[in-house]
Amino acid sequence: EQEGVLFGKHSNIISFFGSHLKVRRADGALMTASVSPYPIELDKFVKKRQWEEAARLCRFVKSEPLWAALAGGAIGSLHLDTAEIALAAMKEVDKLHYILYIKDIPLEEGQNAEIALYQRRPDEAERILLQANPPLIYRAIKMNIRLFRWKRALQIAERHKKHIDTVLYYRQKFLTSHNRSEEEPRFKELFAEVEINEDAIAEKKAKEHEEEERIADSRGSSRKEGKF
């Protein structure tokens, strides 16, 4: 910051090599300055996916901005173990809990969708879920419910003829908690037609999770068999 004051306004960077730069001030004076080499080194480690080396560098420097950069790089590269380490070092409890939640998702597509959602790309997250093999319909519906995108959640449920009662159940809870009555015509129709059984909805949710676990196990077995 002090160097920025010395450079003054309308200064131009002439060269930047390694951690050294030359700046020409508005009055024509040529000045040199240096920056920390650690962000550059960290960037090299992240690009090469050398996560242990990156974490070791951050522990040595003990800089929160450096940990933050590592967390961002790890999340962007879907390396959740390193993201967990970085967020724990920063004591970002809420973000750490979210990463732990993502790590607990059985299927890679589910994890990738949550990362996209974390990066504020909900449409991309939905696309990942619906284009999975098999499509993760329940997760796509629940994601839209979490985002209060009720019409989209219902649209997916009706298109695939699955979990319409789940959408209605959470919609009803939402309206009740906000002391509101239903005004959307299609939701009104379905509330009159569809039975909402909380136990049945919970059972279907459990079955969806079991199915994801089964698929994850079968994929793991296939990968192991492919090694021989």
Stretches with model-predicted labels:
Residues 1-228:
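Extended alpha-helical assembly domains of large eukaryotic scaffold proteins
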